[in-house]
Amino acid sequence: GFLTAEEKGLVNGLWGKVNVDEVGGEALGRLLVVYPWTQRFFESFGDLSSADAIMSNAKVKAHGKKVLNSFSDGLKNIDDLKGAFAKLSELHCDKLHVDPENFRLLGNVLVCVLAHHFGHDFNPQVQAAFQKVVAGVANALAHKYH
């Protein structure tokens, strides 16, 4: 696999402490605030007029929760991310035409949110391992483009 045994240990150790539902909503919300052009995929979600509106939007929270639960499932198949995300890749790429760059942006935002939540526990080694994971997931999601 692309992660060492040690890196897998770091990732799983931290992930076990993550409140997936909460962090998912925060990560997707921040994506929409920090990179406003990503909002065009979520026009049906209602009020996205300000940072506060986005962060408290129930549909954003619900989709963020869904996104991070899928990410969580992917971590269980860390050595076959392409297989784990094949269906979601098809949906986002073929049906929704999401630019794969957005998957990378969301991965980077997720890393920021984890750093924010875990402080000292999110040390450089943990960050490096997670950065590999989010890059791997983004590549798996972009797979249908290649």
UniProtKB/Swiss-Prot annotation:
Alphabetical GO biological process terms: cellular oxidant detoxification; hydrogen peroxide catabolic process
SUPFAM superfamilies in the record: Globin-like (SSF46458)
Every Globin domain range: 2-146
Residue numbers bearing the Phosphoserine modification: S44
Signal sequence, renumbered to the chain: none
Alphabetically ordered keywords of this record: Acetylation, Heme, Iron, Metal-binding, Oxygen transport, Phosphoprotein, S-nitrosylation, Transport
Modified residues (N6-acetyllysine): K59, K82, K144
GO terms for cellular component: haptoglobin-hemoglobin complex; hemoglobin complex
Pfam families referenced in this protein's UniProt entry, alphabetically: Globin
PROSITE patterns, per the entry: GLOBIN
Residues bearing PTM N-acetylserine: G1
MF annotations from Gene Ontology: heme binding; hemoglobin alpha binding; metal ion binding; oxygen binding; oxygen carrier activity
Binding-site list for heme b: H63, H92
Tissue and organ expression note: Red blood cells.
Residues recorded as bearing S-nitrosocysteine in the entry: C93
Keyword Transmembrane: no
UniProt key word Phosphoprotein: yes
PANTHER family, alphabetized: HEMOGLOBIN FAMILY MEMBER (PTHR11442), HEMOGLOBIN SUBUNIT BETA (PTHR11442:SF42)
Function per UniProt: Involved in oxygen transport from the lung to the various peripheral tissues.
Entry similarity comment: Belongs to the globin family.
Subunit structure: Heterotetramer of two alpha chains and two beta chains.
UniProt-recorded name of the protein: Hemoglobin subunit beta-A/B
Organism, as annotated: Felis catus (Cat)
